[in-house]
Amino acid sequence: MGRQRLPVIVGFGGVNAAGRSSGHHAYTRMTWSAQSGAQRNRTLAALTTMMGLEPGNPHEQYILDHTLIRRIEASHFDVDAVDWNQRLPMQNDDQPVHFDLERRHLPDVIPPHWVVTDNSVTHVSVQITGQQAFLLPTKRAFEVKSAGQLPTGFEPGKLYPSRNHPRGLQMTVYAASDALGSLGLDWEDVTRRVAVDQISVYAGSAMGQLDSAGAGGMLKSRYNGQRVTSKYCPLSFAEMPADFINAYVLGSLGSTGASLGACASFLYNLRNGIDDIRSGRARVAFVGAAEAPITPEIMEGYSAMGALATEKGLRQLDGLSDEQAPDFRRA
């Protein structure tokens, strides 16, 4: 039986609601009460830097309150005033609706029950009879108000030329850099010994990039009266985290892609990397996954499945009245 190469994990990194993965800082934050004072201090120092806080000042309680699962912060969206379009049906047979508007705002296809009259070169008068449905931009309170968010104040897109990249890809670049930093070697030392086509990258996003800089913007721009840009579609691809690791961090030429399987996406990518090393297709494998699903649209989808704790549900679990605030940390 021939010898088989043994894959060895030589570094890891990332970022999540508990902070940086490297140095076991995220693990320390999640197991805070069980950690020694020395390990807590190291993690506090790391989070102080991440969150842009002034070193040397006591920030422990602030850091604890602004990491892990908590009330969704305004940097994502206002949970008390989420934008949406309310359907507004109107029926006007006896008293037609009249309004004036600029000619350039007329729809390309005039509805059959509209009567358009010229007022001037630039403006027209519109009369509507019969039934007409409008979409009224308004606000509403979001049912789900808690999520695991990156530490308050940490914005990965500010650490490199992000150029309006979706948040998941910003996190990917930071996470890959964090993993390389934990390696203990300069990446140039590795590439001097390993050919660029012997380095494989497997990383993806099961949901894709669905915020406003990716597929989210592509899908809702026209409905909001905006234009679709050329970046929305390509930046939303599910395998784009692997492409970004290559483009911004590694510059390798080996196998690149992603296997997707909901919560198991990372494990599938890990298997791909292990198979590459065992088979000899690669000497180095870089694997990961990135998800940034804190948007009203995605969270509403999961909430409809019953997969997220609503504010009302938390109150019912704790026996609270409508006036009492639930403990969002327990969501």
Regions of interest found by a model, annotated:
Residues 200, 262, 285:
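Short glycine- and Lys/Arg-enriched binding-loop motifs that mark or flank ligand-binding interfaces
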Residues 269:
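Active-site histidine-anchored catalytic micro-motif
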Residues 1-254, 275, 290, 294, ...:
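Conserved "HGTGT" condensation-loop signature of ketosynthase/thiolase-family condensing enzymes
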Residues 297-300:
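A short secondary-structure junction signal
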Residues 254-261:
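Short pre-catalytic strand/loop immediately N-terminal to key active-site residues, enriched for Gly-Thr
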Residues 266:
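Short conserved active-site loop signatures built around small residues
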Residues 279-285:
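Short, high-confidence coil segments that cap the C-terminus of an alpha-helix
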